[in-house]
């Protein structure tokens, strides 16, 4: 149809996931093949990139090897007269830790104000921009010996005030946490019984003034960070944030005021 596709060619320098596998003893051969690709009539080779396997680790030995492989290929291809506008390799961790940024960067989790790991450079001050909140859906007083939720794995030992919250595993409130808790009215409160698909039950102090529609903080500020949640379920912040489903409305703020609410359902 007379339209050329602009492409970015990926080099696999050690991630072993996707891309054109770069072998140390075949640099010339690989570069020649990429030159042939750049000359195909239907495409424009606009960019070339790689991805690091250990960018968020303190030990940079393997990352340095990947960087060497990538830069060697870039130089070899340029020497063959192939002009590429955008060379890029920096994810969030690489942006924080390394000086070589090439023509573009690919920030991911740092756009949400979260560090990729506890082994990266913390000298850049970033602030979390995302919180996961729910609402209280029910408040009840239960007598001692009452079972709660599926499987009856939790029984009240005394009279307890139990709050149901409108958040469950279908929303991204992970069932795999070892010691799940939330904050209600600034008070840390434990989840009791198994987390359900749409609801979860929370034990609150008997004297707490709590009512339906009160806010519940799952994660998102100094009280409980996404990293706290990730550690509690042997995961990483990336996974915890990605698990928040489309069932949860997105509320956008600017200068403390709601500017948009997006509900995908």
Kindly give the residue locations of the regions a language model identified:
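Active-site loop/helix belt of alpha/beta enzymes
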Residues: 3-6, 13-135, 142-143, 261
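Internal, well-ordered alpha-helical scaffold/interface segments
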Residues: 134-137, 163
